[in-house]
Swiss-Prot record:
Domain of life per record: Bacteria
Cofactor(s) named in the record: [4Fe-4S] cluster
Pathway annotation: Isoprenoid biosynthesis; isopentenyl diphosphate biosynthesis via DXP pathway; isopentenyl diphosphate from 1-deoxy-D-xylulose 5-phosphate: step 5/6
Co-factor: note: Binds 1 [4Fe-4S] cluster.
Protein name in UniProt: 4-hydroxy-3-methylbut-2-en-1-yl diphosphate synthase (flavodoxin)
Function: Converts 2C-methyl-D-erythritol 2,4-cyclodiphosphate (ME-2,4cPP) into 1-hydroxy-2-methyl-2-(E)-butenyl 4-diphosphate.
Length: 364
């Protein structure tokens, strides 16, 4: 059982972050925020995938104003991502953003940052101090050098400097992120930061890459930190559809026993005994379980000889052979089905399990 680090708790809309609240999953839209229809559609898909909090880029006043319509169309808290222009932060808050993400060091000085803090206080909203290895102040780079796995001081000091600036103006509804594209720099940086602050931490590896590289890098870095009890909210950054970020995030949390959403799908890697198109079968089953909420374990195996035994912990599973497949529950044979009907019958069984869960869960 993982023991979470004790942190303060802040409220991002309806989602609590830090304290004893669950580790929340975030993503960021990749649409033009000013395109309300496309952005709202993406927010809806993110929420359906389980996303707790979404961030949108605010490039100008039109984007800030668009937040008002987006908030009306989505019950998910929306964070405004701000760079350089403090007026955009204020406008985003006025238009219903649940929080803002800034790097106070690039807002144009303390006077402008103070105006942002005053607006956040007035609206009762938190601020994320988000520092990336590529946005560190020049004097800190000169003093400490560029962040590496063995030297994360510039990242940490940049974050703490900006936190102190907010605190100076009486503001403490803060969460912090210090992101690098390097796994060990990210890990070591957050480990050191967690020792010197009790503000909630937003975990992430920036510019992680595509589906495979990004998933591996983020899972290694964030998995280490989460297993040490570090981290209150997270984003898996991928050069993909943002919905994939949410799916990877929940799979990571599931693997660590931190949080579960929907079914867990296990499948064998195939071998010479496989006599069916397991790749296609597993892909089609995965598409269905992604829309389910029942916290069950589903197995897709390629061999009727070893499949049920190897996946006996699964609540329900499927294994194929030559012309004949089987459906098993907890390793015990449940049905024999002709191969051409195997997928159809199995999906019907999955939908029945989901209906049972929904009836029980919703007290229907």
């Amino acid at each position: 059982m993982i023991s979470r680090r004790s942190t303060r708790q802040i409220q991002v809309g309806r989602v609590a972050v830090g304290g004893d609240s669950p580790v929340s999953v975030q993503s960021m839209t990749n649409t033009d925020t000013r395109d309300i229809e496309k952005t709202a559609e993406q927010l809806q898909r993110l929420q359906q995938a389980g996303c707790d909090i979404a961030r949108v880029a605010v490039l100008d006043q039109d984007a800030a104003r668009a937040i008002s319509a987006l908030v009306d169309m989505s019950s998910m808290p929306i964070i405004a991502d701000i760079h350089f222009d403090y007026r955009l932060a204020i406008a985003a808050m006025e238009n219903g953003a649940a929080a803002i993400r800034i790097n106070p060091g690039n807002l144009g000085g303390e006077e402008k940052t103070a105006k942002v803090v005053a607006a956040a206080k007035m609206h009762g909203l938190p601020i994320r101090v988000g520092v990336n290895s590529g946005s560190i102040e020049k004097d800190l780079l000169k003093k400490y050098g560029y962040p590496t796995a063995d030297n994360t001081q510039a990242l940490i000091e940049s974050a703490l400097r900006n936190v102190r600036l907010l605190e100076k103006h009486g503001f403490e509804q803060i969460k912090i992120s210090i992101k690098s594209s390097d796994v060990l720099t990210t890990v070591n940086g957050y480990q050191q930061l967690s020792k010197v602050t009790d503000y909630p931490l937003h975990l992430g590896v920036t510019e992680a890459g595509g589906l495979i590289a990004g998933t591996v890098k983020s899972s290694v870095a964030l998995g280490i930190l989460l297993n040490q009890g570090i981290g209150d909210t997270l984003r898996i950054s991928l050069t993909r559809d943002p919905v994939e970020e949410v799916r990877v995030a929940f799979e990571l949390l599931r693997c660590l026993g931190i949080r579960q959403r929907g079914p867990e799908l296990i499948s064998c890697p195939t071998c010479g005994r496989t006599r069916i198109d397991l790749f296609s079968l597993a892909e089609k089953v995965e598409q269905v379980v992604q829309a389910m909420e029942a916290p069950i374990k589903v197995a897709v195996m390629g061999c009727v000889v070893n499949g049920p035994g190897e996946a006996k912990e699964a609540d329900i599973g499927i294994a194929g052979g030559e012309g004949l497949g089987i459906i098993f529950k907890k390793g015990v044979l449940y049905k024999k089905v002709a191969e051409e009907q195997l997928l159809e019958v199995f999906l019907a069984e999955l939908r029945e399990l989901e209906e049972e869960y929904q009836k029980k869960h919703n007290n229907v």
